Amino acid sequence: MFDGTETVKLLDELGVTHVVWLPDSELGTWHTALAASKKIRLIRVCREGEAFGIAAGLHLGGARPIVVIQCTGFYEAGDALRNVVHDLGLPIFMIVGYRGYYGGIAGRKDTAATFLEPIVAAWNLTHKLFTKESKLNELASFYRETQEQGRAAAALIAETRT
């Protein structure tokens, strides 16, 4: 999918100050580039629900954080997401790894993929799917558009790893 070094460079150009995350097998490949960044602070969390509270505090303090988690963690973080996005109205941007988008392992369906888009829609969250054909500049445009409009949003990154 998106290369870690190129993604970190883009996030820096977009003015992202913090990446609050609990990585998965696909997005975790960005770790080396994120950890080496001199401008973006990487904040590792134990549970995905923590990521939203931390990102909210950073945002309220004037930072420009994003949350990076896998779809199964997105499910776990529902109440924190609801509070931050809908009750507080904060424009937190999320990158969500879409596990199972390209199928399961050895013919088994990964139900993690079954629920992501319906749940994102149920949360009334602006979102966009990024597949292996997508370009990094499309992610940049989506980020800029939603931040300029003051809306929380989720970039759903179709994972090619299982």
Which functions belong to the PLM regions below?
Residues 1-162:
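Thiamine diphosphate
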